[in-house]
Amino acid sequence: MMIEILIAVGILGGLGLIFGLVLAAASKVFYVETDPRLEQLNECLPGANCGGCGYAGCGGYAEAVLNGEAPIGKCASGGNECAQAMAAIMGVKAEAVTRKVALVRCSGEKRYDKSGNLVAGAKVKAEYEGFKDCTAASKIGGNGPLSCKFGCLGFGTCVKACKYDAISIVHGVAKVNEDRCVGCMACAAVCPRHLIVPVEPERNVVIACASLAKGAVTTRGCTTGCIGCGLCKKICPNGAITVEQNLARIDYSKCDNCGLCATVCPKHLIKNSKVETLGEPVIHSMNNPDAKV
């Protein structure tokens, strides 16, 4: 009995040794040498895999940089420090990366009176009862549940896309927390209304609206939308504001952040501070700001 056990153990041990030798030989024969710079590039990146660079993850971007398929400086989360470190590894010079944050171009926060009637913000033409997703909602009834076809739908698709908890839904409109935002713009990629754009944090004056409708149409759909009146353009001392397609626009190469435009805007959609500090993300229903969905 003991001899049989020893024989079995010996056979198994021999097979293990043979297989080990075969695997060791195979690893030598089929070994593919990797560039040590790839690991170094990966170490420079934050590892968030946010996709803001256009690649599936940090590893994909690092490999693309190594192969010369992607420029250095596309990692918004890593910022300038990351870009300079990657440039040093690749032996090239990288331009300074300017930090940017996301801006949601909508001022249609819905305000209600004690009776539940809408008194300010984007008007709701129908209550949406479907899947809580902005893309899905935007396809209902032509332009979604809002009267304004340019406004934020407020179902939090951008909130779900953000890996940094930098976006909240406040009174039916997405708001960005500048302190948490890294500028990866993953939120912009999923917004069906294309409302989210990158801006420099130092820019204290922004136009929080994206409506291209004529003034009368905008007013029917939202009490706080841009009507293209041009008052902001007239008061700007630097000629930094133009009105194109019924929407005021700021040329930041001319803007000195004086804020005069905000003082004359009849709709109060020109903000002196483009990003608000918010609490925990809360998604409200379209018609009732107190009801979470």
Predicted regions and their residues:
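Cys/His-clustered metal-coordination modules, chiefly Zn-binding fingers
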Residues: A213-K214, A240-L247
